[in-house]
Amino acid sequence: TMPSERPDHRLQELWQPIGIVGCITAFNFPMAVFAWNFCLASVCGNSIIWKPSPHATGCADAIKKIWDKVAGEHKELVLVYKGGNDEAIALCKDPNISLVSATGSTQMGKELAPLVSARLGRTLLELGGNNAAIICPTADLDLTVKGVTFSAAGTTGQRCTTLRRAFVHENIYKEFMEKLHAYYATLKVGDPSDASSQ
């Protein structure tokens, strides 16, 4: 509840559960993306069916095991539905699923959204991030180079917020590119289990 502009009145917001939320996650950051969806769904009184990437089912197993341990009689509020494309399609077509939240490529969204909308379902799509940096003449170029590099190469570039392009003011373009090339040359790319790899 919150105050109203009208004297002696208050405004009240009520969240109405919508039912079952289907959550389709990609291979990268599978637990984080599920957690965001789960928190939003559950705080509004909804259950969730999680269809993880076939490349990250171990993460789903671990989360489900923890959930079952702490959920008591509410274990069924989180279900895990493993599989690939066929299972994702089935989840999208199921009229019992009120909302499908999917994270992945733009192509995946183009294929799944029509399946949900054909039954007048709801979608929440996080697809194909395409991020840019705008670098102004007043920028601290040493700091900017580090930020741009981390945004483009951090976590091997496998995240939706990965930097794909930079717009650099012409007055600083040459200096920025020299610093960027020099910084990239210091990156140690290698086996991810090797602590010296970046």
Identify the meaning behind each predicted range.
Residues K69-V70, Q107-Q198:
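ALDH superfamily catalytic-core signature
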Residues M2-L143:
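Rossmann-like NAD(P) dinucleotide-binding subdomain of oxidoreductase/dehydrogenase enzymes
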